């Protein structure tokens, strides 16, 4: 192409188009910095080393004077310049901003990390604030009490119930810790000691049973055995006193039922025979027995009325005898045999006397009769009470 621009040369004087395409030689390159003495001094003035950095107050005294000349004593030495612009310094921020060598360029990763940490800090702050607010809201006793009261729960009653249950459990634990003897004494030791002291004074004998509690225990056990023996004998006597009565279950044998039916038939036949004999005049009716029976009934009724009235006075009209019939037309009849009524069901029925269940006074008295020492007055008083 005619108007194609020429490629610049690489400093060797030969154009790039004239160089062979597949040449393997490495071309020479120019240095990045011109290290001539004049350029080095200029660079040293423009870029001082970090070791030569001083405070701003000291640097202001070394500035150029009014004529523009510098002090040779303050000029830095001829040192090769450094290309490291990132200077790590732990000094104050004032020193870093006062000199250009103290500045360091941040990396891209550092920016991202700083942004991430700032966001995380903000999120943590918000979360902590929200959690603190939630905790305050949850721990607010007034709001919680209002919610529980609306649900029908009384906090004070629940607390009282909890305290009572705790106190009950504590008291139960305390009672469980108390050791109870296996066998309690039959009599109280204090009462036994008082009675023994009283008896000792009557017998002119000074006794102090409280000093030796084993004496009280022995007396209590002796009284227990004595009472046990008396009660055992009374129970045995009461069992012997009561007879075992057979319970009538309502079932009878066929033989007894047949015998009863035969006896009833014989009784009816005998009564019919007696009536026929009276009607034929072979026997006379016994009026005297009837009158006697009526008189006894009147007397019994009079006695009952007198007892009810509370006076023993009897009136004549109450004791008047019944007039005997004197009709001439009455038929004479013989005496009815008294064994007829005896054979009937009008006779007395024998039954066993009702006994008191359990132990009664006479059982105890009979048990004490075998005890000859110190029971005479008790037995006499007991029998007197039974008679009354």
From Swiss-Prot:
Among the GO molecular function terms of this UniProt record, one is: DNA binding
Regions of biased composition (Low complexity) lie at 127-139
Which UniProt keywords are given for this protein, alphabetically ordered? Coiled coil, Nucleus, Phosphoprotein, Transcription, Transcription regulation
Enumerate the Gene Ontology biological process terms: transcription initiation at RNA polymerase II promoter
Q: Which residues form a coiled coil?
A: 279-297
**Which residues in this protein are found as Phosphoserine?**
36, 49, 80
Feature: compositional bias, Basic and acidic residues: 106-126
Domain of life (superkingdom): Eukaryota
- Cellular component, GO annotation: transcription factor TFIID complex
InterPro entries, per the entry: TAF4 (IPR045144), TAF4_C (IPR007900)
- Is this entry keyworded Iron? no
One Pfam family matching this protein: TAF4
Q: Where is this region: Disordered?
A: 1-143
Domain (Histone-fold): residue spans on this chain: 193-261
Family annotation (CDD domains): HFD_TAF4
Keyword Phosphoprotein (UniProt): yes
Bias type Polar residues, positions: 12-22, 43-64, 79-98
Where is it predominantly found?
nucleus
Per UniProt, subcellular location reads as: Nucleus
Per the entry, what this protein does is: Functions as a component of the DNA-binding general transcription factor complex TFIID. Binding of TFIID to a promoter (with or without TATA element) is the initial step in pre-initiation complex (PIC) formation. TFIID plays a key role in the regulation of gene expression by RNA polymerase II through different activities such as transcription activator interaction, core promoter recognition and selectivity, TFIIA and TFIIB interaction, chromatin modification (histone acetylation by TAF1), facilitation of DNA opening and initiation of transcription.
* Binding partners and assembly: TAF4 heterodimerizes with TAF12, forming ultimately an octamer consisting of a TAF6/TAF9 heterotetramer core flanked by TAF4/TAF12 dimers on either side, similar to the histone H2A/H2B/H3/H4 octamer. The 1.2 MDa TFIID complex is composed of TATA binding protein (TBP) and the 14 TBP-associated factors. One copy of each TAF1, TAF2, TAF3, TAF7, TAF8, TAF11, TAF13, two copies of each TAF4, TAF5, TAF6, TAF9, TAF10, TAF12, and three copies of TAF14.
Q: Which family does it belong to?
A: Belongs to the TAF4 family.
Q: What is this protein called?
A: Transcription initiation factor TFIID subunit 4
User: What is the native source organism of this protein?
Assistant: Saccharomyces cerevisiae (strain YJM789)
């Amino acid at each position: 192409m005619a108007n194609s621009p020429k490629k610049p040369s690489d400093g060797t004087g030969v154009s790039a188009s004239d160089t062979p395409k597949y040449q393997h030689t490495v071309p020479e390159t120019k240095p990045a910095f011109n290290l001539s003495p004049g350029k080095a001094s200029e660079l040293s003035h423009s870029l001082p080393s970090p070791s030569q950095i001083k405070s701003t107050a000291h640097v202001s005294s070394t500035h150029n004077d009014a004529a523009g000349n510098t002090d040779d004593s303050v000029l830095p030495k001829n040192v090769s310049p450094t290309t490291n612009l990132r200077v790590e310094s732990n000094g104050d921020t004032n020193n870093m901003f006062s000199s250009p060598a103290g500045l360091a360029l941040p990396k891209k990763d550092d920016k991202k990390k700083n942004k991430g940490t700032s966001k995380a800090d903000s999120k943590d702050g918000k979360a902590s604030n929200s959690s603190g607010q939630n905790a305050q809201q949850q721990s607010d006793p007034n709001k919680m009490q209002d919610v529980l009261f609306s649900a029908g729960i009384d906090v004070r009653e629940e607390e009282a119930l909890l305290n009572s249950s705790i106190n009950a459990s504590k008291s139960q634990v305390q009672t469980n810790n108390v050791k109870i003897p296996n066998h309690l004494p039959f009599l109280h030791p204090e009462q036994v000691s008082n009675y023994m002291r009283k008896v000792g004074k009557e017998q002119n004998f000074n006794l102090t049973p409280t000093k030796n509690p084993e004496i009280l225990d022995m007396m209590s056990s002796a009284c227990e055995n004595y009472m046990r023996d008396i009660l055992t004998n009374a129970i045995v006597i009461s069992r012997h006193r009561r007879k075992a009565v057979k319970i009538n279950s309502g079932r009878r044998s066929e033989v007894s039922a047949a015998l009863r039916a035969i006896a009833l038939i014989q009784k009816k036949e005998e009564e019919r025979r007696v009536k026929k004999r009276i009607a034929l005049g072979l026997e006379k009716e016994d009026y005297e027995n009837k009158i006697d029976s009526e008189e006894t009934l009147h007397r019994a009724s009079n006695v009952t009325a007198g007892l009810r009235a509370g006076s023993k006075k009897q009136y004549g009209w109450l004791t008047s005898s019944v007039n005997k019939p004197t009709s001439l037309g009455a038929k004479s009849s013989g005496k009815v045999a008294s064994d007829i009524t005896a054979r009937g069901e009008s006779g007395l029925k024998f039954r066993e006397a009702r006994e008191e269940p359990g132990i009664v006074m006479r059982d105890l008295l009979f048990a004490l009769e075998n005890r000859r020492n110190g029971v005479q007055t008790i037995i006499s008083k007991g029998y007197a009470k039974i008679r009354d």
